[in-house]
């Protein structure tokens, strides 16, 4: 029996905030929790949505780390604080930053404080689309396919594309950068008091899925592969890493400085970091061949399989398959959608535009009342749209959408792809458009399952986690109907932070392996959605229409090549054929 006076801390860095929990290592019960919204990010400093630039200042992360842990320890009390055994961290990814030789992000150094290129390049930053395209073209020139374990396509959301973009665009950063570091590797390094980036323990999770590390070729691709891509990368691999570590291992122990700042014992173990969805899958009690879907602003879909059962199988077009990236000893496979909750948030933003831009100038209503009206309306829009969309008869459905509002992550990454809604007429209203967007996100999820199955990886069921999964029965029921399989919703509202806590307990030696931590600390499931047999065939036909529309978009945006001119006559002819094909299925 594990002593009940052992506690661990799980820290979950999301896109907008950092969430920290203190959990009982015996049963996973949440003792305390705290959320910190990044103040600079909230003001959208250093970001430019028009060019898909999204950067985050390291101070948002550092301040959030200290604030949330201190708040948790205040809630939990001195007795709990004295018995904290370990801390583990998950973050978004790929979210890398330029650092100096000591491992300090350049944005923390004089002269770089307000330079976006010296900050963390958030996962959804798509400024490096051209660099990603160059990497993909370059990879085809070599006998060894160094992209084979990342689905065969390198994304603009990932490490090397972002590094190359920063090096090309910023002479100041280029002259001061020593290495490039993922967020999930930097926080443990910070907590352990690291001052030499060469000693930083890099997690296999980010290394395998985003940085092209693989044991099959002895680590990273050879220097000549990168040097021939661009001379700016010549020699860079020597300043990165050769070894990687799974997240059940310790990165070290907390430094005296951080122990003092946080009020923790100097014996606290710091675990090796990983990306949020991977630790979230563990927090959500993932099982072999069950697709674990972390559904928030985007989705990250995780699947684990015993290494001996999938040996030799490479799944094309996903975000990678890496031994030990989720559960040590199993192949962790990652896929996902670039916009899920963000697609709904975009439509909400469109609908609230008049309130934000016209009502605020009203001479009839005070600014305080306007602010209250905007906040109240914004809070109610998605729930009300969901309620009315749910009441729509499927016989009346005409609108059809594609969910690539932030590009396409999986299958077959292409961040230049765009969303679309067709089939609208003068009877189309907001609930109908919203329903089409929700349906499209569910179809995008189905495309991922279809890809796994086509490539010989069975999907036995679905596990739902995250804000959308817990807050929207309408979306989850449609997901079950579209997928034609049940989806279980995990009870924990903080599966990523809980997963981090499970890894912390394992790194501290409280458990021998993370599966034991899952069994002891897992909170179970509190909802399950089953497909409605009356709607399954309807959605099967609609899904074929979705694929036709997606194919049309891909063909007629020239695969995202905006410098090519479309032939109007051919476009009109193909558009007419698309509409006829869609209408014929009604």
Enumerate the language-model features and the residues they cover.
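N-terminal glycine/serine-rich phosphate-binding loop of ATP-dependent small-molecule kinases
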Residues: 1-108, 235-238, 260, 264-269, ...
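Conserved ATP-utilizing enzyme core subdomain
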Residues: 19-21, 192-197, 365, 369-419
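Active-site phosphate-binding/coordination module
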Residues: 58, 78-158
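Activation-segment/catalytic-loop signature of the eukaryotic protein kinase fold
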Residues: 390-489
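ATP-dependent carbohydrate kinase catalytic cores
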Residues: 158, 212-328, 338-339, 351, ...
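Acidic, glycine/GT-rich loop-and beta-edge segments that sit at the periphery of enzyme/chaperone cores
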Residues: 157, 335, 343-345, 350-372, ...
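Glycine-rich phosphate-binding/hydrolytic loop that grips phosphoryl groups
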Residues: 133, 275, 279-283, 341, ...
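Gly/Ser/Thr-rich active-site cleft segment
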Residues: 13-15, 137, 142-274, 358, ...
């Amino acid at each position: 029996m594990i002593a009940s006076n052992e506690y661990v801390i799980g820290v979950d860095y999301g896109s907008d905030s950092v969430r920290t929990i203190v959990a009982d290592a015996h049963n996973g019960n949440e003792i305390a929790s705290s959320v910190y919204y990044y103040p600079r990010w909230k003001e959208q400093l250093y970001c430019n949505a028009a060019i898909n630039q999204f950067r985050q200042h390291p101070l948002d992360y550092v301040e959030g780390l200290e604030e949330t842990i201190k708040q948790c320890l205040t809630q939990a009390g001195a007795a709990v604080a004295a018995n904290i055994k370990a801390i583990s961290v998950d973050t978004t990814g790929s979210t890398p930053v330029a650092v100096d030789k000591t491992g300090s992000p350049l944005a923390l150094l004089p002269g770089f404080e307000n330079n976006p290129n010296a900050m963390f390049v958030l996962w959804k930053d798509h400024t490096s689309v051209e660099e990603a395209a160059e990497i993909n073209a370059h990879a085809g020139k070599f006998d060894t396919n160094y992209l084979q374990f990342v689905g065969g396509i390198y994304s603009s959301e990932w490490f090397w594309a972002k590094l190359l973009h920063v090096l090309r665009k910023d002479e100041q950063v280029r002259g001061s950068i020593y290495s490039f570091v993922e967020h999930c590797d930097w926080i443990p390094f910070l907590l352990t008091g690291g001052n030499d980036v060469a000693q930083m323990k890099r997690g296999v999770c980010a290394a395998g899925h985003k940085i092209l590390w693989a044991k099959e070729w002895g680590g990273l691709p050879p220097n000549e592969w990168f040097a021939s891509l661009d001379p700016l990368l010549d020699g860079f691999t020597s300043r990165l890493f050769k070894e990687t570590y799974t997240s059940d291992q310790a990165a070290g122990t907390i430094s005296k400085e951080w122990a003092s700042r946080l009020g923790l014992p100097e014996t606290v173990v710091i675990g090796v970091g990983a990306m949020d969805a991977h630790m979230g899958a563990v927090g959500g009690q993932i099982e072999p061949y069950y697709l674990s879907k972390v559904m928030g602003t985007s989705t990250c879909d995780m699947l684990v399989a015993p290494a001996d059962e999938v040996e030799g199988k490479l799944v094309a077009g996903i975000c990678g398959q890496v031994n030990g990236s989720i559960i040590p000893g199993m192949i962790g496979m990652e896929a996902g959608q670039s916009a899920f909750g963000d697609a709904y948030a975009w439509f909400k933003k469109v609908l609230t535009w008049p309130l934000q831009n016209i009502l605020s100038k009203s001479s009839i209503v005070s600014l305080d009342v306007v602010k209250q009206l905007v906040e109240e309306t914004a809070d109610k829009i998605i729930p009300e749209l969901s309620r009315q969309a749910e009441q729509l008869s499927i016989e009346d459905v005409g609108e059809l959408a594609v969910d690539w509002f932030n590009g396409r992550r999986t299958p077959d990454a292409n961040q230049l792809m765009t969303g679309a809604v067709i089939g609208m007429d003068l009877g189309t209203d907001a609930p109908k458009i919203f329903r089409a967007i929700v349906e499209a996100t569910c179809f995008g999820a189905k495309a991922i399952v279809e890809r796994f199955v086509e490539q010989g990886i069975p999907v036995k069921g679905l596990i739902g986690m995250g804000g959308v999964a817990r807050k929207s029965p309408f979306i989850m029921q449609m997901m079950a109907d579209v997928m034609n399989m049940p989806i279980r919703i995990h009870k924990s509202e903080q599966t990523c932070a809980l997963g981090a806590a499970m890894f912390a307990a394992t790194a501290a030696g409280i458990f021998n392996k993370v599966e034991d931590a899952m069994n002891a600390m897992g909170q179970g499931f509190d909802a399950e959605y089953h497909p409605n047999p009356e709607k399954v065939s309807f959605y099967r036909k609609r899904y074929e229409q979705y694929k036709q529309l997606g194919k049309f978009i891909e063909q007629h945006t020239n695969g995202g090549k905006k410098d090519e001119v479309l032939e109007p006559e051919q476009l009109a002819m193909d558009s007419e054929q698309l509409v006829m094909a869609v209408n014929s299925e009604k």
